[in-house]
Amino acid sequence: MITNRSHDLLTRARPSGLWGRLAQFPLVRILIVVLFLVPEAMFHNLTIVHIVEKMPHPWFTVLLDVVSILDVALVVFLYSRYTRWIEKRPAVEFGLRGAGREFGAGALISVLLVGMAWGAIVIGGSYRVLGVAHPWILLHAAIRFGTGAFLQVMIFRVILFRLTDELIGTYAALALAAMIFGLAHAINGNLTASGLAGLIVGDVLLVAAFALTRRVWFVWGMHAAWNFCQDGVLGMPNSGVTELPSWLEVEVEGPWWLTGGEFGIEASVTATALSILVGVGILQRARARGQVLRPVWKRVVELPDPLVE
């Protein structure tokens, strides 16, 4: 597996003056990168309101998928501009060497985790298939969950975790990012205590995956495959969202600790326990590879020279 060193993602800028130093403070850079991404949000909202929503089916679905893919491309471009202009470094998070293998490895882990949690539900007699949709829906689901997962990886791991990691260290940043990720999903509805715990534990797993490689591919594959399998294929709620179309039409009835209830598999005891085991394992591997940063006040690092335009 290809990995960046944790220090490869630190800013290389050498600011002079008060405003220059202030702009390089990690929490300020979170605001700056958000401003860089504003054009993507404007593009998305304008195209959805003025073009996509006016289209009949099936063109509505096709154009929605196209816009989602363009969203990802635009985020990659804008974030790359941010790292080059503000942090004076290349966006090594998007390095393509070994990308397919990393994405596949992350996806395989999630397929196995969801498969084991789903298997427990089936064995418990709580899962019944009522119907099967056209296979075409799987392509739409792959695009929907793939692009959605990428954007969440960018927001919660590449931006929020990475920049707070640079300031307060990996462990504290991991806890903060996981808590914010869990609370951010409260707007989905159907949030329970077990659902919140499952989300926090799940994000610990995902943040650990990013901390290990310091690239988007491994964690993206893990996040996308989890949502795709849970909702797009198996027809179960995804983080409290129940109205999305799925390949399988199913009925799930059973205790919350087994099924996760209306929130989804991630709220089940099985999925939470498995995520803890795998997340701790990945985090230990990241530590063994020297990918865990200490807080800024406890480390001294010699950074490479900044990029010269």
Which residues fall in each region the model found?
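N-terminal, membrane-interfacial amphipathic/helix-forming hydrophobic leader that caps
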Residues: 1-90, 231-309
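Aromatic-anchored segments of alpha-helical transmembrane domains
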Residues: 37-42, 114-120, 178-187, 224-233
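Function-critical hydrophobic alpha-helical transmembrane segments in multi-pass membrane proteins
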Residues: 77, 130-191, 201, 208
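Transmembrane alpha-helix boundary signature
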Residues: 85-88, 114-130
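Hydrophobic residues within alpha-helical transmembrane segments
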Residues: 100, 108, 143, 147, ...
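Mid-bilayer segments of alpha-helical transmembrane spans in multi-pass integral membrane proteins
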Residues: 107-119, 145-146, 150, 232
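Residues that define the loop-to-transmembrane-helix transition and helix capping
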Residues: 171-172, 214-217, 266
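Functionally important transmembrane alpha-helices
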Residues: 195-257
